[in-house]
Amino acid sequence: WRVDAVEEKPTVRKPVPPFTTSTLQQEANRKLRLSARETMRCAQGLYERGFITYMRTDSVHLSDQAISASRSCVESLYGKEYLSKGPRQFNTKARNAQEAHEAIRPSGESFRTPGDTGLEGRDLAVYELIWKRTVASQMAEARLTMLSVDLSSGKASFRAGGKRIDFPGFFRAYVEGSDDPDAALEGQEVLLPALAVGDAPKPKEVEPLGHQTQPPARFSEASLVKMLEKEGIGRPSTYASIIGTIVDRGYATLLGNALTPSFTAFAVTALLEEHFPDLVDTSFTARMENTLDEISHGKVQYLPYLEGFYKGDEGLETQVQQREGDIDPGASRTIDLEGLSSVVRIGRFGAYLEAKRVSDDGEEELIKATLPQEITPADLDEDQAELILKQKADGPEAIGEDPETGDLVYLLFGQYGPYVQRGQVSDENPKPKRASRPKGQKPEDLTLEDALGLLR
């Protein structure tokens, strides 16, 4: 092994702008695990009680009063060396920003520190987030040195990268995506051993690691708000309600921090894309938002626009009349998933499986089985579908016997997903022992030993 090159490159990191509505929702989701709706509820309460400025804004501008208050906080809490060289203003980059209000910040001529507010719980957490971000915007840049070392061994070349913090600057108050700036400072540094060109280091271990690209992650509320803002869809006052509507109508569910589309969402999207493509085109929605902005500014009259939207030659009423005859109700509520021999349909009470099978007497019959709510389109595979349909057609199948009680143990599918049960429901045993299957474990992989462990 030989060191071929060592490079140290100084760089700076500038603080991010104060919060807009969308960036507050994104950061509160990442740091505090709050939904957009919960964030806005907290912010509304803080605003009404005089702790922060108006919380529906797309501007990153700070008033002279806010800049002065921020710089006073920096000097008193961190020292003069942590102040930026001069007052710092930011330019709004959001498309179609209205900038009717300044950025979200603590209110008043001087900022109350989070500990002096008397706030508790989520209100305190959201206020502290706003306070830190505002104060950090007037702090000095962080100065870092990027490190790289090139090594070779025979014909193979390797590169190691690192980072050293020379002056933390605004990192002392705020690090994006981290709850604890001090702890985050340690994570910002990746130090390398002191090496010089020509050195011959001895490796302790060499391990080849494979890498595979992954599909894009599901949207979290934070990343969805960011995408809506990027595409020009929605406004500060509507981001939370857009996401709330998606969830309330059952088009998506929150699994952990991920927005997971439902079977209903697949069916509705397919119908709209086939018969009303303009309505689900992002550019159409962005243009509509622009027109609504012009209406709010008095540049466009609202009544002619609405009449054209609903009753014009290409209006919604005309489109529905022209195309509703082409819509097959049965096909529009059917979802074809790759790899399934059965089909998924959407009914009044949710998604269900449908398949044909030949009975013992040779007659063909149609089997329908409700899909548990916890199963998403991405999770449903042929094995799960077969188990659900088999249980519906033949009744529960025992996976074994409990040696202690002699009762049979069953794997069942209920409204909220697979579960195990000891014994059957009877007059003597109206409530048999049940336990949910662990998340992430496929039903077909569940053994008798697993089931007994869950039931104990």
Question: Where on the chain are the PLM-derived regions?
Answer:
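Eukaryotic nuclear/nucleolar intrinsically disordered, charge-dense low-complexity regions
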Residues: R49-I52
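Residues within the DNA-recognition helix of helix-turn-helix
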Residues: C42
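A conserved hydrophobic secondary-structure block that centers on an alpha-helix together
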Residues: E27, K31-T39
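Flexible coil/turn residues that form the inter-helical turn or adjacent wing/linker of helix-turn-helix
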Residues: P17, L32, A217
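Basic, low-complexity terminal or inter-domain segments flanking catalytic cores
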Residues: E7, T11, A36-R37, D58-R456
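Short Lys/Arg-enriched helix C-cap and helix-to-coil transition segments
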Residues: M55
